[in-house]
Regions:
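Catalytic cores of DNA base-excision repair glycosylases
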Residues: 2-229
Length: 229
């Protein structure tokens, strides 16, 4: 008797997402900040633990109920609030600079005009701002009310992508963003991309950690050429 095996010949990313959803459950969050608030939150969160960045963002918002006040703040005043985050000193310089540049370019402190641009043009616009790389720009576009199709690529996604063969092992955030975006199914929307980011980040924080990953517990172990290496 001949057995018929049902092989999943889909590209790797859709298979990964299905496995992660089955193990970790849905990771969608309907709460979205306005784009300027998301920019501030993402700049604070760069290279900083989420719980620290959340706490500092809340305190910064309390100190500056309107972000217009932050445009006029001195780096020293900003640093007194954001000191717990990593790279606090350059961020204290860059935050007011970025907001002032938005005002200079648009006439007011808002990023609503990005809604009319495609993803690539919006990314390029944001990356002209001080302190904004591809990760922060993608977070503004994807996590905010702009709800654009941009994948936020952090160190966890770079590590998973390198181990799974989706990316070169030495890829940086820019390369990772460009290459992963090309591999995403066209049918996936902004919510699909934000969920993929959260799923992969959670896997990277709990199982596929930087050192001594728990490969035997990983739902992607049979898809990973570096499993057990």
């Amino acid at each position: 008797m001949q057995l018929s095996l049902a092989l999943d010949d889909r590209p790797l990313l859709p298979r990964m997402r299905d496995r992660l959803l089955a193990r970790l459950g849905p990771r969608r969050d309907g709460r979205r900040r306005d784009p300027v608030s998301q920019l501030v939150r993402s700049m604070l969160g760069s290279k900083t633990r989420d719980e620290v960045a959340r706490r500092v963002f809340t305190e910064l918002r309390r100190r500056y109920p309107s972000w217009d006040g932050l445009t006029e703040a001195s780096p020293r005043a900003v640093l007194r609030v954001i000191w717990p985050v990593n790279l606090a000193e350059p961020k204290a310089e860059q935050l007011p600079q970025a907001l002032r540049m938005i005002v200079a370019c648009t006439g007011h402190l808002a990023l609503d005009h990005l809604a009319d641009l495609d993803e690539q043009a919006a990314m390029q616009w944001l990356r002209r701002l001080p302190g904004i790389g591809s990760k922060t720009a993608a977070a503004v576009l994807n996590f905010s009310t702009l709800r654009k199709r941009a994948l936020v690529v952090d160190t966890h996604l770079l590590r998973l992508g390198g181990r799974l063969g989706l990316l070169p092992r030495d890829a940086d955030c820019d390369t990772g963003y460009e290459q992963l975006m090309r591999q995403l199914p066209d049918a996936w929307d902004a919510d699909d991309l934000s969920e993929l980011h959260r799923l992969m980040t959670l896997l990277g924080q709990t199982i596929c950690i930087a050192r001594a990953p728990a490969c035997t517990a990983c739902p992607l172990r049979d898809l990973c050429p570096r499993c057990g290496v």
